[in-house]
Amino acid sequence: MKKKCLILFKWPNYLNKYLISKLSNFYEVEHLFISNYKNENFSQTVDKINSTIEYKKIEIVFFDVDFAKFMNFFFINRIKKVKKVMVTYDDYAVHEMNAITANSCDIILCQCPLSTLKYREKGYESYWMPPENDANIFKNYNLNKEIDVLFFGQLRNDRKKFIDFLIDNGIKVKIVGHESNWATEEELIKLISKSKIVLNFSKSLGETVTNYAAADIYKFHYQLKGRLIQSGLCGTLCISEYSPGQEMIFNEKEIPMFRTQDECLEIVNRYLSNNELLKKHSNHFSSKMLELYEEKVNFKPIYKAIDQPTFKKVELVAIPYWYVRIAAKQIIKKNISIWNMLSSFSQLKQVLKVLEKSSIYVQLLVTIETILNILWYSIKSIKSKN
């Protein structure tokens, strides 16, 4: 009999279905969205989730934490009597915050193997889990390879410059997923199957890399992208911009990597001009993906780890001021309005619990800011309704 698990998503997202599908192979799965708890304050949200866990006899909860500042260390600690698994897809951007949130969980699952090592370095039990690696969804249709180069995704930042450079040098590139040129999931998978090469870019897409601890510092990071996994499962070679995550699991023959436009053009031309080389490396890449990284293979050690009775814990010396400040603000902002200001003030005791192990200086600063936030966001709620 399958154990029951609950996925606590922050809000609806296209990646959610992959996690639901993945876990359904191993567990009886329920899911909730934090964004649906619009009329509940912090305490009420926690109580409702705990009631659901008890009523449905949930044994494991998976927390979708990226950019969900409400779903932090203090919130997760209030979820009782279950094994807790943190899931992160964008850890490159929010690792400093996630690494503290992780302390409230038993297992950490990362989209990138580099992030997995970062958590292990701190003593956490962490595993690599790509979201889009289900061979029942992403499969090779064995179609005629009539598309030279396929790119699917948004043409932001310098992606367009790379693609324009290829086109200007005589390479035929099919672009899907930009502006109105969309395809269904099934259409996209068939397009990948009929392509000789899938082109992947690794730079993050935001204007800067989010930094909750201070001002943003970096313009981008090099990420491991899902296109690599999808391409391999569909039997197509992926040529990719460099990222350290993919370098950890693939070599140059499995995924040729470039950094510059000239390197990209040279690699594309090398494979398009040599069908035997293209076929050989495509087959090797696809075989490795299916044998080592396909969903059922990849998740087995994770399932075994979650099933263990006890977990090692990492001791935090302190939780930094910036993190405590964010957590306190999230407690107060939950369902705040001028009409329920008294309820918001009642949540001050939850903020004081957050501050229990902080210095007197931090307690004073955060308490004063919390009172001001209650007043400010209550007044602001009137303006937003007018």
Spans of model-derived segments:
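Extended catalytic core of nucleotide-activated donor transferases of GT-like folds
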Residues: 5-124, 137-138, 372, 376-379
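Catalytic binding pocket for nucleotide-activated donors in carbohydrate/polymer assembly enzymes
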Residues: 9-26, 31-39, 113, 182-314, ...
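Local beta-strand N-terminus motif with an aromatic residue
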Residues: 57-58, 105, 147, 195, ...
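P-loop/Walker A phosphate-binding loop and immediately adjacent motor/lid segment at beta-alpha junctions
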Residues: 76, 121-134, 214-215, 234-236
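Generic beta-sheet signal
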Residues: 87-89, 111, 129, 152, ...
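Conserved catalytic-core segment of nucleotide-activated headgroup transferases in glycan assembly
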Residues: 132-197, 203-213, 218
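C-terminal amphipathic helix plus adjacent low-complexity
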Residues: 276-386
